[in-house]
Amino acid sequence: KGKASLKQEGDKDTRIGVDVNSFVILSERDRVFGSAGYRSEKQENVLWNENIDWKLIAPYVTGDSIGGFLKGETYYFNGGYASESGSWIWGITGGYRASHNYRDKDPRPRNTASDLSFALGAGYRLGTYRLGVSADFRLYQQKSEISFLADKGSTSVYHMLGLGMDYVRFAGKQTGTKHQASGGEEA
């Protein structure tokens, strides 16, 4: 029996990696934590997506009808600190992730992505309730280039808009894109 999958994510995902985590109690009120890791990945039978982080940037992806596999690597680290003093509790966390993926057959995408994030939160104990506020910030950037090296020529590359639509103005030989976003949230 088959398994449901999105064509843009492929139908087989093979990963190998290592993760390191740490949690240290500095005192009765202070904690620090962190993690770092590396992951190597191969997605097979990917169609209509030549980008990394599809779930984050969709539906604005570059795609073609040929598709194939995508190989990639990801490195990340993050950490944080939390403290409690009387009725107050607060914490800060931050992290960075760098990824790249590619294919060594036409069409040949080469994507790099960086993802930086910070969050800060504070809370106050009021009887059996806790009132809290938090803010976070994220800076994400992705650069994508597609090349064709075979003598057979190239296929059309589409800049997808979602719901099966593409941006006709850039269809054809436009093979580079850049996704950049920053933002924050307060709660």
Briefly describe each language-model feature range.
Residues V18-V24, F77-S83, F118-Y124, A187:
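Residues on the lipid-exposed face of transmembrane beta-strands in outer-membrane beta-barrel proteins
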Residues E28-G34, G86-W90, G127-V133:
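Outer-envelope beta-barrel architecture signal
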